[in-house]
């Protein structure tokens, strides 16, 4: 099922778990491609869910979404925005969204600007970590991507849109006010 573009390039969120962006990218290894799916909370730009596999089927993006739901819990009025890839339009993925009360939004066909904040995350991942590396195995790439997301990007990487705070620090500050 292809959903309407409800997000409509409104990349602002007033609270955590209001708008999640999702997409996946590829990392080359000597064993072949490693596919990396990520769910990003638009409020803080925090990677709240991710999955890495040798295949790019619906389970790749479903696992990333399930991690996000497990970490953040079910939220009221949550919007999930992705592209129109077959993984996101699959019956299994759409059922998972519905079962968790999540509204589906999708970019217009072939329009990367409709999910530009997600594209920016992957640009950072590749520029800052994976582009200059040669991974011998998928496991080596998995370990490095995990390190980037969980030990650097979420807790340390500063964002101009967040007042030069990291996603974790931005959320912590927001919880205090």
Q: What name fits each language-model region?
A:
Residues 1-177:
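Charged DNA-binding/catalytic regions of mobile-element recombinases
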């Amino acid at each position: 099922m292809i959903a309407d573009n409800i997000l409509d390039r409104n990349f602002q969120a007033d609270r955590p778990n209001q708008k999640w962006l999702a997409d996946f990218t590829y990392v080359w290894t000597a064993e072949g491609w490693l596919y990396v799916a990520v769910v990003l909370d638009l409020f803080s730009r925090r990677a709240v869910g991710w999955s890495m596999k040798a295949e790019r089927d619906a389970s790749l993006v479903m696992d990333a979404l399930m991690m996000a739901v497990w970490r953040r819990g079910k939220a009221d009025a949550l919007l999930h925005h992705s592209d129109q890839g077959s993984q996101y339009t699959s019956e299994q993925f759409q059922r998972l969204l519905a079962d968790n009360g999540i509204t589906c939004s999708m970019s217009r066909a072939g329009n990367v600007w409709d999910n530009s904040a997600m594209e920016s995350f992957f640009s950072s991942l590749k520029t800052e970590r994976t582009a200059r590396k040669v991974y011998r195995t998928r496991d080596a790439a998995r370990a490095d991507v995990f390190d980037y997301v969980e030990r650097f990007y979420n807790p340390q990487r500063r964002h101009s849109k967040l007042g030069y705070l990291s996603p974790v620090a931005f959320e912590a500050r927001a919880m205090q006010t």
